[in-house]
Amino acid sequence: MENLPFPLKLLSASSLNAPSSTPWVLDIFLTLVFALGFFFLLLPYLSYFRCDDPPSPSPGKRKCPVGRRRRPRGRMKNHSLRAGRECRRGLEETSDLLSQLQSLLGPHLDKGDFGQLSGPDPPGEVGERAPDGASQSSHEPMEDAAPILSLLASPDPQAKHPQDLASTPSPGPMTTSVSSLSASQPPEPSLPLEHPSPEPPALFPHPPHTPDPLACSLPPPKGFTAPPLRDSTLITPSHCDSVALPLGTVPQSLSPHEDLVASVPAISGLGGSNSHVSASSRWQETARTSCAFNSSVQQDHLSRHPPETCQMEAGSLFLLSSDGQNVVGIQVTETAKVNIWEEKENVGSFTNRMTPEKHLNSLRNLAKSLDAEQDTTNPKPFWNMGENSKQLPGPQKLSDPRLWQESFWKNYSQLFWGLPSLHSESLVANAWVTDRSYTLQSPPFLFNEMSNVCPIQRETTMSPLLFQAQPLSHLGPECQPFISSTPQFRPTPMAQAEAQAHLQSSFPVLSPAFPSLIQNTGVACPASQNKVQALSLPETQHPEWPLLRRQLEGRLALPSRVQKSQDVFSVSTPNLPQESLTSILPENFPVSPELRRQLEQHIKKWIIQHWGNLGRIQESLDLMQLQDESPGTSQAKGKPSPWQSSMSTGESSKEAQKVKFQLERDPCPHLGQILGETPQNLSRDMKSFPRKVLGVTSEELERNLRKPLRSDSGSDLLRCTERTHIENILKAHMGRNLGQTNEGLIPVRVRRSWLAVNQALPVSNTHVKTSNLAAPKSGKACVNTAQVLSFLEPCTQQGLGAHIVRFWAKHRWGLPLRVLKPIQCFKLEKVSSLSLTQLAGPSSATCESGAGSEVEVDMFLRKPPMASLRKQVLTKASDHMPESLLASSPAWKQFQRAPRGIPSWNDHEPLKPPPAGQEGRWPSKPLTYSLTGSTQQSRSLGAQSSKAGETREAVPQCRVPLETCMLANLQATSEDVHGFEAPGTSKSSLHPRVSVSQDPRKLCLMEEVVSEFEPGMATKSETQPQVCAAVVLLPDGQASVVPHASENLVSQVPQGHLQSMPTGNMRASQELHDLMAARRSKLVHEEPRKPNCQGSCKSQRPMFPPIHKSEKFRKPNLEKHEERLEGLRTPQLTPVRKTEDTHQDEGVQLLPSKKQPPSVSPFGENIKQIFQWIFSKKKSKPAPVTAESQKTVKNRSCVYSSSAEAQGLMTAVGQMLDEKMSLCHARHASKVNQHKQKFQAPVCGFPCNHRHLFYSEHGRILSYAASSQQATLKSQGCPNRDRQIRNQQPLKSVRCNNEQWGLRHPQILHPKKAVSPVSPPQHWPKTSGASSHHHHCPRHCLLWEGI
């Protein structure tokens, strides 16, 4: 005592005189230490602000502020390192000072009752912890220090065990200063379960001084990566009495030293892996060194103390008996000696101490200070341990006493931060454990009361799969804190079941570790058995049941019956015997029987909950099967029953309900069938139902319906209720369907089945008459199927049967025709080989009628229409024309007499000659010829009867295809028409073809007319619109061109111009002539197609079909244009009076007399009039005429005279068009004249300027429109107007017209240069290359100009 410093002497004296003065001394000392530590803490920051350079006048030297701003990190780092070194020195001094204080305070305390000390520590352990903690704490930075608890250390603080508390200093500053750890005032233990210390409660200022909690603790858990023990042996329970598990829970050992440590708040954020490794290494080394020395002392002490002394109130310094003090002293001394001996082996630097071995190095350094202290002061513990210290074995070599002077001031900083040995090891253990929450823990014990609670807060986060390894097994009635060195945790079956259910169940299940741990701890701790039993309720054992119940209650879509079954199941399942379950899992599946039971219950609950959906899926499958079966059953039995779907629905619902009730009555059936068959059946049905025929007949359905429901309980009441429910459902369904049928509605399911049947019907059956559609077998089948349901009323059955018969007849034959109509129309449009060029607008009435659809379907299938269909077509056509026309029209008679063997649409077959004796009736026969062979385009030359006026009135209203109009409007027809095909009913409809007479004269004239129209069709190849026209023989022998109106003037001018350009008219306008010449030159490639009438008629006859071939390439554009024109097409049957002989005087030459037959027949006269009318009607307008002009034409056609009113109207229209022509004439007159003079061809006699055509195209079109309309009016009875127009035309145009006619008819003007009659397709390539004047203008020059 003489060598101690003054403060220590004062403290020692005060402690000797009065133990109650210890708190006062401690308070003063702690205050000083706190001030010093705070100063050291602020020292780095104070040095940071020392850079206060005075301002210099030169701006270049003012760099200190900039340096501060630019180098704060480097300076702070330097200051931090300097402060760290100072802190380490302070910590070392503080540790030495604390060691002295603890050695002084210990011997002067009175002996206390040691009876309440549980789990006495071996003397070696006490001597091991203190020096380790002190030395380690002295070498650690200030940032790692912990709250001050060192003043309450054991009497031999340097002999305390440091390894049960990690010597890693806590990272943060001191947060608590424990001043209530004095000997006189016991501190109130603060033991939060979240941060409990692994040390037992300690009554001493220093950290847990008993080495046993860590020395004899279990080896590191599975997740604890620590170096193995050197002895590679585990400490058995007989070697130590306390356990310190690294999960942060308070161990079973209740050494009084550890209570204070438990009261210290745990500081998180300890060092990284280095601290962890060092903690684990100290833990293992301490366990190896201390338990070997203290096993005998520990066993002796345990034999003295009863189990009720397992708990001790913390803070009482006078409760230790002399025996306890002796034991503690022995333990501390032994530990210190062992540490001193190990310290001599390896003395590492400070850098080594910062490595994973820093804690061991600091422990050895601390042992040196303990040796020096024991050598100079001979310290003794304050429970009179000094007298037993001489019994301690081991070397007594002490370290250098200079440690007192070197570490005095370091002790202050260490006291400020607190000795980390107090709790750092426990914190390290917690840090290791928190990262691995699955590590097992031992249940803690409270220190102020008997332990009646088990640690369930931490254990709830533990993985349940680890419970199969390490249980707590030795917490017996004596509450001894022993844990088996080879723990075997045997989880309860419930824990295993819950664990597997949690992994495999689709429902959220609470952690099964909670109840399992409760049961385990309930077995270990007798005091907590009641609580465990209270918690071991069915809902606790099965935490998913309440959750499932809440989920089921919250599901609105879940049926009430399922909810009820779920409630019943959740209540009855816990009491079910296990033997009632049948294992549905594989036998080799590694689960316990309890787990199997849990899984089966869970699966059954899931099935109960989702069985409604499964039933609905099965019901939908049954419906799909029924719909798939209906076509086959309808063919076999006549018609599928509409009640099969409802019966199937009832069947599936019945099966689903049976399963539900069975599950409710017997919650634990054999689930193998449910799990195996239900999904397999569903998948098998999904794969096979399209090909599977539903094998449930009406009789089977009735038997299944009447058969009592299978039930394990055999409840008749339940069967009757279920049967009644199903019958009510069926009755309601049938009543609803019957009401719909009475109201004229069709049930949805019946409609679907009929649609399926109709889709399966062959198309060939669509031509059966409606009156014969209702098959008697189908009606019988319907009635029979209705009789199957015996619970239905007879009147209901009969009504349903009759309705089904009617509906079957109507739906089977009406709907397919209406559906097939647009389909066939679409196909006709897509298939070019079957599509025909449309020459007229469709008939709306015919298109909408079912007969028209049948005709169209028949045409698509290339089958001859039946007699009934022809009759229907005639009936539909008669709705839009006078009956007198139909009655007097031989065409309709011939159409009705048409044989079934109608020739197919062969484009290349030769035309059949008419019967003999029919040639004389040619004027009254419709002459049809085709210009495009591939598109079946036909043009008709028909005769018009005396009732042409009535016909014209009917034509604009009817708007049927051209051939139908011609058939309906031409009164006088020939009876030698060989084949009518079904008349078209849409835009793409087929057109009838009439054979052409084989008379040579007729053929010659026929081809001559064709030659006039053919170049107009060729303009389509140049992407120029076209107007179709029909040449009709008028009753008076004159010819009339029936132009078809187009949509715009641009598409009207070229075709109409070419069609109506006369040769004999010498008064055409200059612009009109230019446009005609340009169009003619464009069609130069069509010149060889100009038929020649010079040859014999027999040679001309085979030439006509090739003309059809030559027009193939023009089909696409022609079809498109014809579709545009048919909406506005209005046939004009214009009566043309025989004009004066002015045409003849002006050079118009018809066919020579040598080409006429010897006797001029009416046919020849009519042909002559045709050409006269064509050549005179040079400006007939192909565009749609105005309503006024149409009305005028119609009136003139009816009256067939030049009345004053008609002449006035025509004059007004002519004036309007003349004004338009005059405007365009002035604009293009000069260009046209220059153009004609420069490019006049010697043979053609008309210009071929390309650029002029493009630049003046618009003006020519306008001028042509005006002149064409005037010419039309002139030809219809305006001679004055015609004379005015002719006077205005230049003579040059007249000459060109004559030349053009000569070119067009070389046999007339140049009989010596006749061309041999060859087919145009074979001749035109040679002709195009023969003449040289065609090469300079291949696009616009044309020898054979058409109309």
Curated annotation (Swiss-Prot):
Mark out the compositionally biased spans (Basic and acidic residues).
1108-1127, 1137-1146
Q: Residue ranges under compositional bias (Polar residues)?
A: 165-178, 627-651, 927-948
Q: State the UniProt keywords alphabetically.
A: Differentiation, Membrane, Spermatogenesis, Transmembrane, Transmembrane helix
A GO BP term here is: cell differentiation
The record describes its membrane topology as:
Single-pass membrane protein
Q: What are the boundaries of the region Disordered? A: 55-87, 108-142, 154-235, 373-397, 627-658, 900-955, 1084-1161, 1313-1335
Q: Which cysteine pairs make disulfide bonds? A: none
What protein name applies here? Spermatogenesis-associated protein 31A3
The entry assigns this protein to a family as follows: Belongs to the SPATA31 family.
The residue ranges flagged as biased composition, category Pro residues, are: 198-211
- Predominantly, its location class is membrane
Task: State the function annotated in the UniProt record.
Answer: May play a role in spermatogenesis.
The regions listed as transmembrane in this protein's record are: 23-43
Where does this one sit in the cell?
Answer: Membrane
| Bias type Basic residues, positions | 60-82
Gene Ontology annotations for the cellular component aspect, listed alphabetically:
membrane
Record-linked InterPro entries: SPATA31, SPATA31F3-like
Question: What domain of life is recorded for the organism?
Answer: Eukaryota
Q: Name one Pfam family in it.
A: FAM75
